[in-house]
Design a protein with these regions (language model features):
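Primarily ABC-family ATPase nucleotide-binding module
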Residues: 314-352
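Transmembrane helix-loop-helix hairpins at lipid-water interfaces of multipass membrane proteins
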Residues: 19-73, 153-158, 270-273
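Hydrophobic alpha-helical segments in the permease module
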Residues: 59-74, 167-171, 240-254, 273-295
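Hydrophobic alpha-helical transmembrane segments of ABC transporter permease domains
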Residues: 24, 28-36, 41, 121-166, ...
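An intracellular "coupling" helix at the cytosolic face of ABC transporter transmembrane type-1 domains
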Residues: 10-18, 105-106, 122-131, 135, ...
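Membrane-integrated ABC transporters
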Residues: 1-33, 52-59, 77, 81, ...
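Cytosolic ends of transmembrane helices, especially the final helix of ABC transmembrane type-1 domains
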Residues: 214, 238, 285-313
């Protein structure tokens, strides 16, 4: 698993281990956020039973414990996610620079300066954002939601299905858009590289452009490249928004199906009001983080282009050879050397 994460997200071995820790901490943090929901459920149950007065201290202590647990889990999640991410960021940049120093020169013949500069700067920055904001939150939300979903079936399987059917459908919509998003992002990257290459070329040849009075013609072509990047950026964002927006709209249908199925079962007497109330609370708590998870999933898919570019360099074969050189038979010897001027003044005589 660690090896797969290393190639998937261009991580070091330690970075992959830290990524797993960040996912676990995000999962635990999300589960702890359900503690207030559980307290509210038991509060309503005791209130309806008429014995709330005997358990005031229990709920006060429960609120304090929940507050402490949320604070501790958030602190651990922050350290496991953000601090480790930026430590890994430094390792990634140094490793990338060392790799560029050791790989064969034939690799650089296939790349231009703007491409390599973008890989070192922009791609690394994009993967930093993905590692700190998108990936741990996405996997943590999926794992915690799966655990909560399993627990819902122990209360009422019909209500659980009504609440959860929208989750796989929503993720399937965003997941199936992966090829479209990757295609759009690859084209966007090509246009960005062409634009960056044009700007770099302009800076290097600005004197020649002025000498031949071709600034206006060159700037027209460069302006066209910039506009092409802007236009395709709109298309890329729109393509992502169509899938994410559609999946979020379907996610909202879960609240309606829970209310509808719960109302029917309640009218038939097959469901008590307390369980109905609990499911309404749970779906309101689950769906909001899952909307963010859908955006994170789209962002993770989009960052696959940058990850592939980094992995191309990090996985490239290193130039073979030795780090030390042994000089055998190449000594320069200064033996019996003499030197004098034409006037006969001797400067050196039999010097070794």
């Amino acid at each position: 698993m660690i090896e797969k994460l290393m190639h998937k997200y261009a991580l070091s071995k330690q970075g992959a281990s830290d990524m797993i820790k960040a996912i676990i901490s995000a999962t635990i943090s999300n589960i702890i956020l359900m503690v207030p929901v559980a307290l509210l459920y038991y509060l309503v149950r005791d209130y309806m039973a008429g014995n709330l007065g005997d358990k005031v201290l229990f709920y006060v202590a429960g609120c304090l414990i929940a507050f402490v647990l949320i604070g501790i889990s958030t602190y651990i999640q922050y350290n496991a996610t953000f601090l480790s991410t930026y430590v890994e960021s430094g390792v990634r940049r140094v490793t990338l620079a060392e790799k560029l120093r050791k790989i064969p020169l034939s690799f650089f013949g296939k790349k231009d300066l703007s491409d390599l500069t973008s890989t070192i700067m922009n791609d690394c920055a994009q993967m930093e954002t993905a590692s700190s904001h998108f990936i741990p939150e996405l996997f943590g939300a999926c794992i915690s939601t799966a655990l909560i979903a399993v627990s819902l079936f122990f209360f009422d399987w019909r209500m659980a299905i009504a609440a959860l059917w929208v989750l796989p459908v929503s993720f399937l919509i965003v997941g199936c858009s992966g090829k479209v998003q990757k295609s759009l992002n690859k084209k966007q990257m090509v246009l960005k590289m062409a634009c960056a290459d044009g700007i770099q070329e302009c800076l290097e040849n600005v004197r020649d452009l002025q000498s031949y009075n071709t600034q206006e013609d060159y700037m027209k072509g460069l302006t066209g490249k910039i506009k092409a990047v802007e236009k395709h950026a709109i298309v890329t964002e729109l393509g992502t928004a169509v899938f994410v927006g559609s999946s979020q709209m379907i996610l909202k249908l879960g609240i309606a199906t829970v209310a509808l199925v719960g109302g029917v079962l309640l009218a038939k007497g097959e469901l008590d009001i307390l369980t109905f109330f609990m499911f309404l609370m749970v779906v309101s708590r689950i769906y909001d983080p899952m909307q963010v998870s859908l955006q994170n999933l789209a962002a993770v898919i989009a960052s696959g282009v940058q990850s592939d570019r980094l992995d191309e360099i990090l996985s490239h074969e290193v130039q073979e050879g030795t780090n030390t050189m042994k000089h055998d038979g190449y000594d320069i010897e200064f033996s019996n050397v003499g030197f004098s001027y034409e006037t006969g003044d001797v400067v050196l005589k039999d010097v070794s």
